[in-house]
Swiss-Prot record:
Residues 1-22 form the signal peptide. InterPro entries: DNA/RNA_non-sp_Endonuclease_sf, Endo_G_ENPP1-like_dom, His-Me_finger_sf, Non-specific_endonuclease. PANTHER family: ENDONUCLEASE RELATED, ENDONUCLEASE-RELATED. Pfam families: Endonuclease_NS (PF01223). The gene is Tsal1. It is found in: Secreted. Binds double-stranded DNA (dsDNA) with high affinity. Binds double-stranded RNA. Binds single-stranded DNA with lower affinity and with a preference for purine-rich sequences. Shows residual nuclease activity for dsDNA. May facilitate blood meal intake by lowering the local viscosity created by the release of host DNA. This is Salivary protein Tsal1. Its EC number is 3.1.-.-. Active from pH 5.5 to 11.0.
């Protein structure tokens, strides 16, 4: 099923929103830059009380007269200063207001709105797992979204992949990123505190004492495991959307030097291409295979905790970028291992980086995560967790 993040375009078309002769507008980041900005939703039509998440069409999104916005402070104990959890604004005489002269800028929540993960009936990973939507709850019965979704393994308590949209027309106007603590919303056997402890360097040194890769300690002061986002906050525009990516269900352990190195570069060049083309890219990000290390003379698969199959550490981080409009795509694989110097055998497809005009010399630097490029058809039989019904006939090129 196609990710439902086209909601903004659908809503704007339904309401007849265009860039000319509009009566009201929202400008980003100005309209959403306060970290306590409420979730903004657009009423689908005046004939229904259904809403879609606001999806900007650029730096400025225009709306016609009588467009209705719903602002909501989602999450526990969250509300406006007047005690209400939601408020409706109507476009009238070139301004959005609540009928009493109060505009969007006067409504901030007591804290950043939070999202929740909702299990759907949609299957993923060859039908073995379920898709979880990341949504905002605006009432006991009503959910709005998703912001992105996750194919989640509730048995090993980890994501198979996360899927998000890069909105090339608007993402460069996003609210700046800020470091945020992780939360744990789906796991049954560990808490947020447990996860935070797993990512403490001193705990990792103790956990992996005696583990080596190519004769080097698995973990040291420079190379250690960090919580690496799959759907990145850098692809999200509003504070609430960004906060939703800091859930452990959207995280896999990645070497910090790799996550801050070539994983970061892949995210950046993909986002830049979407901006340059003013395109919407559908992006799947996940881990592939398990990292191994030598321990007591034996090669072992690696897990952050001593409990096997929980908090597994992937050997590769992949990012599958789909440009549906042009029937094009590319799959990046980054080796989650800054220790290995001999990368022979690392690639399992014909490397298409040069053909795709991805010419960053850093991709060959193993200390930042050796990175190569594949066509979808070359690797779909390897990465079986991804939807096998996706058909891509062209290589996505970065020029």
């Amino acid at each position: 099923m196609a990710l439902k993040l086209v909601y903004g375009v659908f809503t704007l078309a339904l309401l007849g929103i265009s860039s000319v002769n509009a009566d009201c507008s929202l400008k980003i980041p100005e309209s959403v830059e306060n970290e306590k900005t409420p979730v903004i939703m657009v009423r689908k039509s005046l004939k229904t009380f259904e809403y879609d998440l606001f999806q900007p069409t650029g730096e400025v999104t225009n709306f016609p007269e009588r467009t209705e916005l719903l602002l909501a402070c989602t999450g526990a104990q969250n509300y406006f200063k007047n005690g209400e959890e939601s408020v409706t604004l109507m476009c009238h005489n070139n301004e959005f207001d609540d009928g009493q002269g109060n505009g969007l800028d006067l409504f901030t929540c007591v804290k950043t709105p939070t999202a929740e993960l909702r299990k759907t009936k949609e299957r993923c990973s060859l039908g073995d797992l379920y898709v979880y939507d990341v949504v905002f709850r605006i009432s006991e019965e009503e959910l709005v979204g998703p912001v992105y979704d996750i194919c989640y393994n509730e048995y090993s308590q980890k994501p198979a992949y996360s899927r998000n949209i890069i909105n090339g027309a608007a993402v460069n106007y996003r609210v700046p990123e800020s470091e945020t603590d992780l939360t744990v919303s789906l796991a049954k056997d560990f808490t947020t505190r447990d996860v935070n402890n797993y990512f403490k360097l001193e705990n990792q040194k103790q956990r992996f004492q005696g583990y080596t890769i190519d004769g080097k300690p698995l973990v040291d002061d420079k190379n250690f495991f960090a919580p690496g986002q799959l759907a990145p906050d850098t692809s999200m525009i509003t504070p609430a959307d960004k906060l939703s990516t800091y859930d452990y269900a959207n995280i896999v352990p990645q070497y910090k030097t790799v996550y801050d190195g070539n994983v970061w570069r892949v995210e950046n060049i993909t986002r830049d291409l979407a901006v340059n083309r003013q395109a919407k890219f559908e992006v799947y990000t996940g881990g592939y295979e398990r990292l191994t290390a030598l321990h007591n003379g034996k090669e072992e698969e690696i897990f952050l905790s001593a409990k096997k199959y929980v908090h597994e550490i992937p050997k590769y981080i992949y990012k599958f970028v789909v440009d549906k409009e042009n029937d094009a795509g590319i799959v990046f694989f980054t080796l989650n291992n800054p220790h290995v110097k001999n990368v022979k055998g690392t690639e399992f497809c014909k490397n298409q980086c040069e053909e795709a005009n991805v010419l960053d010399s850093n991709f060959k630097d193993w200390t930042q995560g050796y990175t190569f490029c594949c066509t979808w058809n070359n690797v779909k039989d390897y990465v079986r967790a991804l939807p096998q019904d996706i058909e891509i006939n062209n290589l996505l090129k970065f020029n």
